[in-house]
A protein has these predicted regions:
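Catalytic-core helical/loop segments in enzymes performing group transfer/polymerization on anionic/lipid-linked
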Residues: 1-452
Length: 452
C-alpha cells in the first residue's frame, strides 16, 4: 500500500469508529498505535531490534559521559545525531543548537545515527550531553521481559473489529508494551537523576511513552518543530489526541504552522509559539562566500538536490535523466545519509556527503526535492524549488502551501524540466517569509516561562 493510501485508510477509520475510547491504564493508545499501523501497511519503519541496531546501541553507550545526567539541569533536550550540520569545524544542531551557543543549563540526550553513532566531543559544542542509547537499551529490554504479561486494553473488542474490518494484521499488544516500556524507562531515568524543569523534544511522536512519564511527574514538554508540520504529515492530522502523550507547547517555524495548529488542530497542544529555526540564521551569517565560485566559470547554473531516505533511488534516477541532456548545468546531489546504491552516469552530477545543505541552498540557483522541508528553507535563501512530484507526494504535501509566484514548480517527468526551469530561473519572485526571525530570543523567551 502506498503512503497516501495508508493515510486515507487511517482517516477513514477515525471517522467511522470511536478510536479514542481504546485505552490502556486510562490513556488513549490510538494516537500511538495509528503511527505503527500505518507503517505496518507501508513497510516504512523498521521496528525490529536487529543485530546491527543492538550493536550500535551498545557501542554508543559511552560515546559521551553518562554521568553528566547526574547533574541538575533546567532543561533536557531530546534530539538526534542526524540533525547536526557542519558549521566550520563544529557539527551544530540545526534545531536545538541555540542551547549550547547560549550556554543554557541543558542536558542534551541524543539518539545515535544509524550506521554511525555520534560525533566526537571535539566536533560538537555541547558540554553536557549523553547518548539516548541508555534509554533505548533499557526500554527494549523492558519490552522483551514484559512479553509474558498481556496488557489489559479497554474497548479491545473495538480495536479487534477495526483490524478485522480493514483486513489488517497488526500485533497491537506488542506496541502497547513498547509504549509502557518507554514510559517505565523514562520513569527510571527520572528516579535516578535530578528532574529537569522542562523537556524539549524535536520528534515527540516517536517517544510518546517518554511524554507519559514526564506528565506523570508534572514536567512540561515543549516540542521543537524539526520538519514538515501540516495536515499532510501523518503525526499532525489525527482526529483526536491524548494530552498525556502530546506536548504542552509547540515551537513552530513560522506563521503557517502557527495557523494550522491554532485554527485547525488546537487539540494537538495547548500553546503554540513561533520561534523560527536556529540553523538558518547561523548558516546565513557564517556562509558568506559563494561555494560555487569556480564552478560558475564552467556551468551556466547550479542545481542542488536534497535527497530523502525513502526516495533516494527514484529521485537520483530522475536527476540523472535530466542531467544527461543539460551539460551546461551542474547538478549537486546531497543525500540525507551515506549510501552506496546511488549511482549517476552523467558527468555533470556530483554526489556529495556530509556537507551543510544550507550552505549549498544559499548559493544554488535552483533546488530540487520531492517533499523535503529544504523546500521551505530554500525560501529563506530566496532559492526557487522544482518539486519532483513522485507518486503525487509533492503536490499532496505542498501544492496548497506554495503559490507559483513563490518560485516553485511541480513536475512528474524529466521532459517537463525545461518548462519549469525557464519559468522560475532568473525571474523576480515573491518568496514566502516562512521562518520567524530572531530565533534565539524567541526560544529563550519560551524557555524562561518554564524555568523561572
Amino acid at each position: 500500500m502506498e503512503a497516501l493510501e495508508s493515510v486515507k485508510l487511517i482517516k477513514g477509520i477515525e471517522q467511522k469508529y470511536d478510536v479514542i475510547s481504546i485505552k490502556w491504564k486510562g490513556i488513549s493508545v490510538w494516537p500511538f498505535l495509528r503511527l505503527y499501523i500505518k507503517d505496518s501497511v507501508t513497510s516504512q519503519r523498521e521496528n525490529k531490534a536487529s543485530a546491527s541496531n543492538i550493536g550500535l546501541v551498545l557501542r554508543c553507550l559511552f560515546a559521551y559521559n553518562p554521568f553528566r545526567a547526574l547533574k541538575r539541569h533546567d532543561i533536557w533536550s531530546f534530539t538526534a545525531c542526524d540533525r547536526r550540520k557542519r558549521i566550520g569545524d563544529k557539527m551544530v544542531h540545526r534545531i536545538s543548537g541555540a542551547f549550547a551557543a547560549q550556554g543554557v543549563n541543558c542536558l542534551m540526550i541524543e539518539k545515535p545515527l544509524k550506521g554511525f553513532g555520534h560525533y566526537s566531543r571535539k566536533e560538537i559544542e555541547e558540554q553536557d550531553i549523553i547518548s539516548e542509547s541508555w534509554l533505548l537499551m533499557t526500554f527494549h529490554a523492558m519490552e522483551v521481559f514484559s512479553r509474558l504479561i498481556t496488557p489489559k486494553i479497554e474497548n479491545e473488542d473495538l480495536l479487534k473489529k477495526i483490524l478485522a474490518d480493514n483486513n489488517l494484521q497488526f500485533n497491537y499488544l506488542r506496541y502497547v508494551r513498547m509504549l509502557n516500556a518507554q514510559r517505565r524507562a523514562m520513569r527510571l531515568l527520572l528516579l535516578l537523576n535530578p528532574k529537569p524543569k522542562v523537556v524539549m523534544i524535536e520528534c515527540p511522536y516517536d517517544v510518546m511513552g517518554y511524554q507519559c512519564a514526564f506528565h506523570e511527574k508534572g514536567i512540561n514538554v515543549v516540542e521543537m518543530q524539526h520538519g514538515s508540520l501540516n495536515g499532510n504529515h501523518f503525526s499532525y492530522n489525527a482526529r483526536e489526541y491524548e494530552p498525556k502523550m502530546n506536548p504542552d507547547c509547540v515551537c513552530v517555524f513560522g506563521e503557517e504552522e502557527y495557523k494550522y495548529l491554532t485554527e485547525e488542530k488546537p487539540q494537538y497542544a495547548p500553546y503554540v509559539k513561533m520561534t523560527g529555526m536556529y540553523m538558518l540564521e547561523r548558516a546565513d551569517q557564517y556562509f558568506s562566500n559563494d561555494i560555487f565560485k569556480e564552478e560558475r566559470k564552467k556551468y551556466d547554473s547550479i542545481i542542488v538536490i536534497s535527497g530523502q531516505p525513502a526516495w533516494e533511488i527514484p529521485l537520483s534516477k530522475f536527476v540523472d535523466s535530466i542531467a544527461s541532456g543539460h551539460d551546461n548545468i551542474l547538478f549537486v546531489y546531497i543525500p540525507r545519509h551515506q549510501r552506496e546504491d546511488i549511482v549517476f552516469n552523467s558527468d555533470n552530477v556530483r554526489l556529495i556527503h556530509g556537507v551543510n545543505i544550507y550552505e549549498y541552498l544559499k548559493w544554488a540557483d535552483i533546488h530540487i526535492t520531492i517533499t523535503s522541508t529544504t523546500s521551505l528553507e530554500a525560501q529563506y535563501f530566496h532559492t526557487p524549488t522544482i518539486f519532483y512530484d513522485y507518486q503525487n507526494l509533492a503536490t499532496n504535501y505542498f501544492k496548497d502551501f506554495f503559490k507559483e509566484e513563490n518560485g516553485v514548480s511541480f513536475i512528474n517527468s524529466a521532459q517537463q524540466f525545461d518548462y519549469a526551469f525557464n519559468k522560475i530561473y532568473g525571474h523576480n519572485l515573491a518568496y514566502q517569509e516562512i521562518f520567524a526571525h530572531d530565533h534565539v530570543k524567541r526560544l529563550m523567551d519560551v524557555v524562561s516561562e518554564y524555568i523561572k
